[in-house]
Amino acid sequence: MMQVTAQTPGFAADVTGINVAKLCEGEFAALYQAWLDFGVLRLRGQRLSDDELQAFSARFGPLEEIPLGRMPAAQRAKIGNRYVTSISNILVDGKPIGGLGNAEAQWHSDMTYTENPPPASILLGIEIP
């Protein structure tokens, strides 16, 4: 059963007791309301494929494709899903493992340069110190 625990009154909550890859409509409605209530939700222990992350994200509204811009062809080739990108400080053979490496690892707000920026971003942490 889903539980929402406030971390800071009115801002940020931990959500436990759910698997976001298998939410029924009622569970998603409760999760969505928690997002509206708290603005930031932390859901620990989620193990999602890129496609599952994309499907979960799409339940919040239309998705934006990764802006390729001036991204070199070698980095573009690493992108398996145009709606999910890997940002990592992990190197393999001296090269970053994700499409962006850790170039986006500093705080920023996604897509704010567009006329209608998205209302949210979803971060799936795989390996966190």
Regions found by a protein language model. Name each.
Residues M2-V40, R44-P129:
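Fe(II)/2-oxoglutarate oxygenase catalytic core
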